Amino acid sequence: MARKKYALIGAGNIGGTLAHLAALKGLGDIVLFDVVEGVPQGKALDLSQCGPVEGFDANIKGSNDYADIAGADVIIVTAGVARKPGMSRDDLLGINLKVMKAVGEGIRDNAPDAFVICITNPLDAMVWALREFSGLPANKVVGMAGVLDSGRFSHFLAEEFGVSVNSVLGGHGDNMVPVLEYSTVSGIPVSELIEMGFSTKEKVDEIIKRTRGGGGEIVALLKTGSAYYAPATSGIAMAEAYLYDQKRILPAAAHLSGEYGIDNLYVGVPVVIGANGVEKVVEVKLSDEAKANLQVSVDAVKELLVACKGIDESLA
């Protein structure tokens, strides 16, 4: 059987961590792409020299040529400018939209059969633009945010309830619309634990607020960059679900065609990821409060797309 091929577009902190994780897990050969000459080559060489020590034999290549991503089974896109302290995701829109155009065209021309995972921010707008520029089917282009948000939410809930993180399942969409009925501790919904007196709604609301600002909290602490370990781990989880046909339910920014009453937008929802990409959007029952919060998120995404179309008329 031919070895699988990963193309990682963007050789920054997330891209480098993705390459290391993919090699350690034996997921296949890796192309690390970046427009800056020397950076992907240097990181690829450094990572390759880990192989004899860590026991992997992945072929890791650094490249500045999109032709080298040809035949990739999975492409994970992290290219773009990272947030700096005081910078909002919306500030990134104009810069990263141009990056998505170049990346989308590179994928279209060299790896049109790949499953594409976008991590670049602002996520909901960038994954939409990437699909538009690449022309790939909507089920083969997805955004990574919900897995990361769920990981952060689960970590904070585990701290609150004093349990193992493995005992917590966080289920909620991108742009942070937590659905507490589907977030459980050892199988018990968080909403019921609040009713039982194990925590308070005020405390859980604080956790939700901290999760919403989870990326910004790390940016403020690092001062010179943004999170990369957890985002990379989340991207690999999505890639594995596709490559191994796991039919795994994961929260992701997926293209909606009427689900949740939303059409032609990328919004964070639970989806089934398997060998056909996004195989199904899981429509869970939402409370009136969750529906209202989801609509706020949808309206924010729509505003970003209007801005995108104003920047690049080909998207209109």
Curated annotation (Swiss-Prot):
Coiled coil: none annotated. Its EC number is 1.1.1.27. InterPro entries: L-lactate/malate_DH (IPR001557), Lactate/malate_DH_C (IPR022383), Lactate/malate_DH_N (IPR001236), Lactate_DH/Glyco_Ohase_4_C (IPR015955), Malate_DH_type3 (IPR011275), NAD(P)-bd_dom_sf (IPR036291). GO terms for molecular function: L-lactate dehydrogenase activity. The active site is at H172 (proton acceptor). SUPFAM superfamilies: LDH C-terminal domain-like, NAD(P)-binding Rossmann-fold domains. GO terms for biological process: lactate metabolic process. It catalyses: (S)-lactate + NAD(+) = pyruvate + NADH + H(+). Substrate binds at R89, N121, R152. It comes from the Eukaryota. Keywords: NAD, Oxidoreductase. NAD(+) binds at D34, V35, V36, E37, G38, V39, N121. Pathway: Fermentation; pyruvate fermentation to lactate; (S)-lactate from pyruvate: step 1/1. The keyword Isomerase does not apply. Homotetramer. Belongs to the LDH/MDH superfamily. LDH family. This is L-lactate dehydrogenase.
